[in-house]
Amino acid sequence: LAKLMAAENITVEHKKIPTAAFDVKNRVLYLPILKWKPGSDTYDLFCAHEVGHALWTPEAGWHSSVSEKGKGFKSFLNVVEDARIEKKIKRKFAGARTHMIGGYRELMNEDFFGLKKMGMDVNDLGLIDRINLYTKAGTDYGIEFSEEEKEWVEKVMRTETFEDVLEVTEALYEYCKENESETDNSYD
């Protein structure tokens, strides 16, 4: 399925890793072997999400944009890029939307992001982590934003190009450095 969606002969590997990933340089899609048996929606979600990276995340700029900004910048970049590529994959493959929603529902129920394990309320997370969960899991989880934070959510949701992603990420990272105590502990 992933090769068909990507429209190229990417390599697909199953590994004992915590989450799915795509190596933009070597064109390898990694799917996790999880401790629990995920349903087909979760598998489809992982494939669709990582195919989004295969189709639209450029190798140039992806890794090099991290070095000067600090270790937390890559997490911010990944959150904003994830929102963009998921929006685009849902446009390209409209049938994937339902499976992605179901997959994120299963991930949230399985505590994939570790909030229950850490005893954390989603609204106690920093802005970037709430944006990450909101753009992935939607409105079902009561994620709250101030009026000012809602503007950042909208900026993230409006990204169309990787250049947009870089621009929004840089501004959001600086905003969070000035307004929050943590920018280096984001969830992927």
Segment roles from a protein language model:
Residues 1-188:
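Short, functionally important secondary-structure microenvironments
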